[in-house]
Structure formats: C-alpha cells, structure tokens
C-alpha cells in the first residue's frame, strides 16, 4: 500500500492546453507532475502491479466551489508518470472525498492498494 501527501492538483482546465488540434500539458501541469515525481522518488515509491484501489482526500486551498472530478485526471496522470503504478487503467475502484479547505496551499492525501 502507498499512502502519500501531495500538493493540491491543478484543475483539468489548467493542466492541459490546446494548441491547434493538439492537446499538451501546460507549464503549470508540468510543474505539478514534476513535483509529484520528486515526492514519489524521495519516498521510495515503486510501481504497483495489477488492479488497484485509489482513495483520494482533497483539501482545497480555499473555500471556492470546486468540482470533485475536476482534479482527478491530472492527479492520476502525475501518479502514473511518477511510477506509483504503470498506467491509470489499473485503477478499478476509486473513492474520492472533498474535505474542508486547508490554507494556504491545500493538499491531497492519496492511498493506493492492490485490489
């Protein structure tokens, strides 16, 4: 099982950008992905195999209204890029919770275990 605290993820609207017909990861998205990779490396996380259960507790940085699902894809991609697992298709069960704001930057608590 992996349990780790990560920075609060950017929304999918800020994670990707469109250039012509192409969709790219934005500068903000690359910075977030790199931070997640560095945290996973520092914690010695190795990729999990097989079907996975992902639990996410999101603590936003402020009290603005946010959609629970607006951060998930960028979080999943950053975790896969940082090798918490091989690919986000491994996630078969997802439990996501939006908690009370945690100023000034918010955070995400992630738990990943094999099914």
What does each model-found stretch correspond to?
Residues 1-115:
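Acidic, proline/glycine-enriched N-terminal capping motif
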């Amino acid at each position: 099982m992996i349990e780790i605290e990560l920075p609060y993820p950017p929304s999918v609207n800020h994670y990707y950008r469109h250039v012509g017909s192409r969709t790219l990861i934005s500068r903000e998205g690359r910075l977030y992905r790199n931070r997640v990779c560095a945290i996973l490396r520092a914690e010695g996380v190795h990729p999990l195999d097989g079907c996975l259960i992902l639990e996410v507790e999101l603590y936003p940085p402020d009290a603005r209204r946010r959609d629970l699902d607006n951060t998930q894809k960028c979080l999943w991609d950053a975790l896969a890029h940082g090798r918490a697992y091989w690919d986000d298709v491994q996630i078969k069960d997802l439990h996501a919770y939006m908690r009370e704001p945690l100023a000034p930057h918010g955070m995400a608590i992630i738990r990943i275990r094999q099914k």
